[in-house]
Amino acid sequence: NFDVVNIPEALDIIGQETKPVNVAVLDSGSPYLPDPAFGGSIFDTEWGWDMEDNDALADDIEFEQGSFSHGTHVGSTISMLNDGVDGNGMSARVTPIRVCYQNGCGPTYSAYLYLNGDNNDSGTSFAQRSGGQPLHSMNMSYGGSGGSATSASCVKLGELADKGVLIASSSGNGGVGSIGWPSACPKVYAVGATNGTDRRSSYSSTNEYVDFSAPGGEYSDWNSDGVDDLVYAYAYVDSYVQTSNNG
């Protein structure tokens, strides 16, 4: 996957001594950190928040139960340093914002308020909990239909983008012509998914709002190597794009 998104070439240009990048991952939470498999990851759990339960415990409960673990996978793709898995963030620090569960995603707008420093149900903010650290990027893997460019969510994401936050979102899983939000918001980078042969994954939403495509998943053996291309699965495409911010 690193070769597909030209990570080696990018490192030749910018060098590996990049500035730390603070990335908010709005998903199902972070892994249970005492697990030694994630000792090399940089998850700033003390900076994050569980928007659904409205508490500071943004752990990925589903991961701990050996079940759904989308947030753990995405966060590790961004920040994993070693132990058999290398992420592409190069010192990226992940702030888990828990908004997603097995049955879907919930209080995403509250998460935008939290990250933007606005009043929200948590009574705190990213700036307060991080000690005034800058937020560089946001990663969102959820979406839905029926949005608009003038919605409160798009406006709030626009405010964050105007502050210099690079915002990436999965384009969605609806196929050709399907439009998902917030990926279609004016100042959000929409990222489609490619399969093992660098073609569009069959499920990936394709529309005029898609800005990039990256490895994202396919449940078939497109390259005829006898192994399902499931290694790319779950449409984690945006996590390969947004960590390229090195400022």
Name each region found by the language model:
Residues G104-S125:
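Catalytic-core regions of hydrolytic enzymes
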Residues T77-L81, Y114-D121, L160-K163:
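Structured segments of extracytoplasmic/periplasmic soluble domains
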Residues V21-A24, G29, V74, A127-A235:
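Catalytic-core segments of hydrolase enzymes
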Residues L57-G66, Y236-G247:
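Short pre-catalytic strand/loop immediately N-terminal to key active-site residues, enriched for Gly-Thr
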Residues V99, A235-Y236:
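Short clusters of small/polar residues that mark proteolytic maturation junctions
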Residues P8-S110, G131-H136, A184-K187, T197-R199, ...:
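Subtilisin-like serine protease catalytic core
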Residues V4, P20, F68-S69, G106-Y109, ...:
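Soluble non-cytosolic domains of exported or imported proteins
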